Amino acid sequence: MRKLLVDTIQGKKEETVFNLNDFPFEHLTTCDLCKKGTHRKYYNVASAFDIETTNVDGVKNAKGEYIVSPFAFMYHWQFCLDIFVIFGRTWEEFTEFFDKLSEECGAFTLCIYVHNLAFEYQFIKDFIEIENMFAKAKRRPMKFTSHKGAIEWRCSYFLSNMSLAKFCESSELCIHYKLLG
């Protein structure tokens, strides 16, 4: 765990950030449950996931053919459960974290919102077992489950039909910490 000073549009704010070894997984046991029809019970807690990625240009030979194809990779992931935030850098940390989180879920489901899930999906699909996908089109999931139903990933972009900045602007008590520019 460490404390970070974060620049926000309202000034600096101190935030606590956890790592894999000290994340308070047990917080789920304090969360209320809600039931969807006669199906599974869900944790009634806000949770969100995001990754940061970058692209690397390919290398072409004199004929214009790629000798090294362009590629993209994830260099940072972040998950928030209520007020608790964890940062990770590797896919090993990602898989270990979500395996531990799903164990803590037990027989209940944690719904995780991802803004533009279709984009994040292209990166995470190779690291978790996808189950029960509902998609708008090929490679455009609106929601899917993983970890034997313990985790349900939902696209907040499809739900809101707004950019993340606009969504935060129109949501009461929501502060968008990402600085513009």
Predicted regions and their residues:
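N-terminal accessory regions of nucleic-acid-interacting proteins
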Residues: M1-I51
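Aromatic-residue detector
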Residues: R2-K3, T54-V59, F119, S163, ...
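Acidic surface patches and DE-rich sequence motifs
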Residues: T8, N61, S146
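Conserved non-catalytic scaffold segment of RNase H-like nuclease domains
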Residues: N21, T30-D32, Y42-S47, I51-L117
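Conserved DEDDh/DEDDy metal-dependent 3′-5′ exonuclease domain
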Residues: C80-G181
